[in-house]
């Protein structure tokens, strides 16, 4: 009954702060409960939570899953003190929250790790890839080694019915972030959008939906997909190929911080310290561990998105309006 009551109180508070939780999960039965508000799929981080509570029978973890934009808005509205940790892959929104004073300081142990202003800790890296259905693309798949090659291939496709998908930057904070990073790295970004739109471009909210479309054959390719969401599907989808372009491969940091209203800073910091520990990292998928930077890579260099004030620039309303003015023109040009 205690857990049901706590769950009801937290979910009621979340709804009052503009959140529409995608799920609420509990790991462990200890009375010292740390509550995490995050964007990541619970199944992918549950092993880390399980390892944390196994170290002490007094500990438990409650995880509330929601979208990055709703989490950002809820933090700004003022979180209930029961929320101990905020985790998100929308690193630009996270950096802005810290800059605006919504975090608490990390421990000395954590400030030695990759962090921003001693308050935001990086605990995972998500490499970004392009996904293709080789049954639809055919032998050409081996030629798609770079974004330039992809653009040229799209130009050469005259047959009808070719479809593609990518994040919709209006729906997805991660999609907007990746679009901005592509613009910084690649002068051909808008040309790529032009060529995708010349066929049938279907912007999407989520990596999972994009992957489903490629697996089913509804889309021939998905641009800018989170790699760790793809790898569990490969054994059951032999037609699916991952492309790691040789020009660059973005990687999104997953980050966490202790919100300023949190009651139990010490327990929150214990959880964050476990996430970046060797034991915690070993419980994550190998594709997202911080050591992914050291792996042999079939494509170009992995370029992690750096924690810096530069991430905040494109969140300016004028900059957003300018981007979406061009996005609307280019993404709908041939549709």
What are these regions (language model features)?
Residues 104-110, 119-122, 238-250, 259-260:
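Short beta-strand->loop
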Residues 39, 46, 82, 89-90, ...:
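Extracytoplasmic ligand-binding site segments that recognize negatively charged/polar headgroups
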Residues 259-315:
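Mature extracytoplasmic/periplasmic domains
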Residues 129-136, 178-180, 252-267, 283-284:
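A bilobed periplasmic-binding-protein/Venus flytrap-type ligand-binding module shared by bacterial periplasmic
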Residues 17-96:
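Early extracytoplasmic/lumenal segment of secretory-pathway proteins
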Residues 91-96, 215-239:
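A ligand-binding cleft/hinge motif common to bilobed small-molecule-binding domains
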Residues 313-335:
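Conserved C-terminal helix/tail region of periplasmic/extracytoplasmic solute-binding proteins
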Residues 11-13, 17:
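N-terminal signal peptide c-region/cleavage motif recognized by signal peptidases
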């Amino acid at each position: 009954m205690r857990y049901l009551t706590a769950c009801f109180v937290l979910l009621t508070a979340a709804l009052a702060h503009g959140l529409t939780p995608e799920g609420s999960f509990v790991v462990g039965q200890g009375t010292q409960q740390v509550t995490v508000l995050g964007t990541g799929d619970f199944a992918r981080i549950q092993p880390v939570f399980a390892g944390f509570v196994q170290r002490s029978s007094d500990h438990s973890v409650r995880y509330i899953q929601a979208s990055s934009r709703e989490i950002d808005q809820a933090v700004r509205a003022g979180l209930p003190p029961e929320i101990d940790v905020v985790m998100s892959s929308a690193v630009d929104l996270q950096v802005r929250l810290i800059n605006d004073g919504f975090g608490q300081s990390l421990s000395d142990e954590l400030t030695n790790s990759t962090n921003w202003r001693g308050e935001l800790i990086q605990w995972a890296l998500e490499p970004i890839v392009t996904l293709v259905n080789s049954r639809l693309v055919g032998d050409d798949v081996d030629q798609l080694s770079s974004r330039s090659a992809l653009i040229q291939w799209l130009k050469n496709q005259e047959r009808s019915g070719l479809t593609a998908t990518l994040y919709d930057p209006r729906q997805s904070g991660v999609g907007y972030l990746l679009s901005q990073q592509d613009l910084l790295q690649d002068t051909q970004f808008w040309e790529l959008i032009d060529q995708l739109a010349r066929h049938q471009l279907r912007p999407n909210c989520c990596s999972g939906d994009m992957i489903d479309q490629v697996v089913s054959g509804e889309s021939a390719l998905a641009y800018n997909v989170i790699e760790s969401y793809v790898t569990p599907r490969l054994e059951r989808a032999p037609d699916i190929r991952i492309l790691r372009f040789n020009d660059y491969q973005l990687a999104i940091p997953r980050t966490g911080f202790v919100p300023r209203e949190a009651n139990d800073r010490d327990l929150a910091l214990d959880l964050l310290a476990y996430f970046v520990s060797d034991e915690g990292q070993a419980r994550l998928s190998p594709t997202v561990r911080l050591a992914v930077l050291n792996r042999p890579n079939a494509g170009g260099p992995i370029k992690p998105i750096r924690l810096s004030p530069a991430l905040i620039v494109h969140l300016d309303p004028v900059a957003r309006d300018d981007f979406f003015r061009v996005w609307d023109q280019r993404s709908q040009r041939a549709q």
